[in-house]
Swiss-Prot record:
Membrane-crossing segments per the record: 83-103, 122-142, 150-170, 183-203, 212-232, 239-259, 277-297, 309-329, 346-366, 383-403, 411-431, 439-459, 476-496, 550-570
Compartment(s) of residence: Membrane
Organism phylogeny: Eukaryota, Fungi, Dikarya, Ascomycota, Pezizomycotina
Gene Ontology terms, MF aspect: transmembrane transporter activity
Keywords for this protein: Glycoprotein, Membrane, Transmembrane, Transmembrane helix, Transport
SUPFAM superfamilies linked: MFS general substrate transporter
Assigned GO CC terms: plasma membrane
Its membrane topology: Multi-pass membrane protein
Protein name as catalogued: MFS transporter L2
Length: 598
């Protein structure tokens, strides 16, 4: 596909970034869990590190025997200092949410001011998502060695640099560099704030606390586009980046004053030797080499281009090499493979990727339906997504509270995937002439289902891990969701291109343009809007709706697969005593004799 310099098609990136926000929101509502109830007992493989005592795997127990075999967590009673520290984390989460959403509506103004092309605008948004995804496991691993708070500071520095560079940029290349750096900081904020909660809040209570992060993302999702639009139209698009600085300043001060965590002690050089440098290079190189062609396939280059296929093949080999290195050679692995080595964990990580695929595909392509078929503008298309965005947060909050009360999470996974399957299926009913009340209802069910799944899957993932591995499990949960989100746009794009071309070929008036029109779902929005009313425009809208229908079908099938998969996850006991050396200093239960090496 040739590089298109038509500025109007920067709309493409607008959707990408706005979805990033929503996704991040979803990513942050997540995290928390531990063991459950059942009649059998299993033993998962302990961590391979000889320096750390093997930790017993989570046990499947009946309610009665659980009290006999598992140390129970004391009632969680946070003090004012903990609450203040948590609020400081909420501030930086809100900052990340506002940044991710506000840039979406400012991109057209940025492109016009700097003379950027559609491809450059596309990468300005996508680069943030890519670096945010691939650096989450790396920053999480570093935080096990150097401490959560230190890595939070480093993430804030990256976010600061990534805010200033685009704010003073005079070309899109500089903006691309800044957004990539900002993505590293954003990924760190997403991963590390969640890991702090895992370290400081008992498993059963975590869902309630993560719901506050969800509220921050919900507010950012709604307010971000309004703020970005106001800056772009009334002041300057550069203020979309400058506005981050007050949040960074306030958040940094409050974190310094109130976030007091227990830290490991040791020489800096000794800690550097614990870093899995080879694993880090293999991981970053392989995931970058995989995600970049997945992202530009069908947008910048055709899927059958060597520029797409060669990086995919090389990165696949790199991923295999990374896994072998982690299993056989790394004394201090970047990723603890023990978090994958039980049936429930494997199924849950699979469904986490699928959840990311479905969520991202719907949040990216649904606004295109509202714009191309319903004739809405970008901001109104975002408003039309409210049935999704406004139901995700309440669904997540209610589920987190319910799991805390019941101590069970399997029911929430089943309910969430049932509603997600039903909600995705209902989208198949969308037509060009679907009424407003109808499309609002059709979007509500899926929003509730995906909202339920955020805390449900996060808690289940952590419950399936040993006590010492829960922070690692939470980190990988965030990574796999972000990984799935990147795949979601790619899979949706392939489905759209194939179905759009097939449908256009059935209309004599549009057959000659089938190849051109089917290549760019977002760019086609402007073509449809610019057409005069008539048969050709009606047929193009019909084709567009029909192509999107197959994306909803794929989402429905994947959701159904996940529903079946979650029938086989186990219920682990969630009332387990915390055992962490990184707890909040106000109520520390650290065992000095057991120092982690990760």
């Amino acid at each position: 596909m040739e590089h298109n310099t038509d500025i109007s098609t920067t709309q493409y990136n607008s959707h990408t970034v706005s979805t990033t926000t929503l996704s991040s929101f979803l990513v942050n509502v997540v995290t928390s869990s531990k063991r459950g109830n059942k009649m059998t007992t299993i033993t998962a493989q302990p961590p391979r590190d000889e320096v750390e005592p093997a930790v017993p795997a989570p046990q499947l127990l009946s309610s009665d025997s659980a009290s006999e075999l598992s140390p129970k967590a004391e009632k969680f009673q946070p003090g004012w200092r903990f609450i203040a520290a948590f609020l400081s984390l909420c501030i930086i989460v809100l900052m990340a949410a506002l940044d991710a959403t506000s840039i979406s509506v400012a991109l057209p103004s940025m492109a016009r001011a700097l003379g950027g092309s559609a491809i450059e605008a596309f990468w300005a948004g996508t680069s943030f998502l890519l670096t945010s995804t691939i650096f989450q496991p790396v920053l999480g691993s570093f935080s096990h060695i150097f401490g959560r708070k230190s890595l939070i500071y480093i993430s804030l520095v990256f976010f600061l640099a990534g805010s200033i560079i685009p704010a003073v940029a005079n070309n899109f290349t500089t903006i691309l560099v800044g957004r990539s750096i900002q993505g590293v900081g954003g990924g760190g904020i997403i991963a590390l704030t969640e890991m702090v909660v895992v370290d400081t809040v008992p498993l059963r209570e975590r869902g309630k606390w993560f719901s506050f992060f969800g509220m921050m993302w919900s507010f950012g999702t709604v307010a971000g586009p309004l703020i970005g639009g106001a800056f772009a139209q009334k002041v300057s698009w550069r203020w979309v980046f400058w506005i981050n600085l007050p949040f960074l300043g306030i958040g940094t001060v409050l974190i310094t004053v109130f976030l007091k965590l227990n830290q490991r002690h040791g020489e800096f050089l000794a800690r550097l030797r614990e870093v899995d440098w080879i694993g880090m290079v293999l991981f970053l190189g392989s995931t970058t080499g995989f995600l970049i062609p997945i992202t530009w396939g069908g947008v910048q280059y055709p899927w059958d281009s060597w520029r797409t296929l060669v990086p995919l093949i090389v990165s696949a080999a790199g991923i295999v090499a990374f896994i072998v290195h982690q299993e056989k050679f790394a004394p201090h692995p970047l990723i603890r493979t023990s978090v994958f080595k039980n049936k429930s964990a494997a199924l849950l990580y699979l469904t986490t990727v699928i959840h990311g695929i479905i969520l991202w595909a719907i949040l990216y392509f649904m606004p295109l339906y509202f714009e191309a078929v319903k004739g809405m503008g970008p901001i109104m298309a975002g408003v039309a997504l409210f049935p999704w965005t406004f139901t995700v947060a309440p669904g997540a909050v209610a589920t987190g509270i319910a799991i805390a009360v019941t101590g069970k999470y399997r029911w929430a996974n089943w309910a969430g995937w049932f509603l997600a399957t039903l909600g995705s299926g209902l989208l198949i009913l969308l037509k060009p002439d679907t009424s407003t009340p109808a499309w609002i209802f059709l979007n509500l069910v899926g929003g509730i289902g995906t909202g339920i799944l955020f805390p449900a899957m996060a808690l289940a993932v952590q419950a399936s891990a040993s006590v010492k591995d829960q922070a690692y499990a939470a980190n990988m949960f965030s990574f796999f969701r972000a990984f799935g989100q990147t795949l979601g746009v790619a899979i949706g794009g392939v489905v759209f291109q194939n179905q759009m071309k097939a449908k256009l070929l059935t209309y004599p008036l549009l057959a000659d343009m089938a190849d051109t029109y089917s290549k760019d779902a977002a760019g086609l929005v402007e073509i449809i809007k610019g057409m005069p009313a008539g048969l050709m425009k009606d047929q193009l809208k019909e084709s567009y709706t029909d192509a999107l229908k197959y994306i909803w079908i794929v989402a429905t099938v994947l959701a159904g697969v996940s529903l079946v998969a979650t029938l086989f996850i186990d219920e682990f006991d969630m009332d387990i005593e915390m055992d962490t050396e990184r707890g909040f200093k106000e109520k520390s239960k650290v065992k000095d004799a057991e120092k982690e090496t990760h």
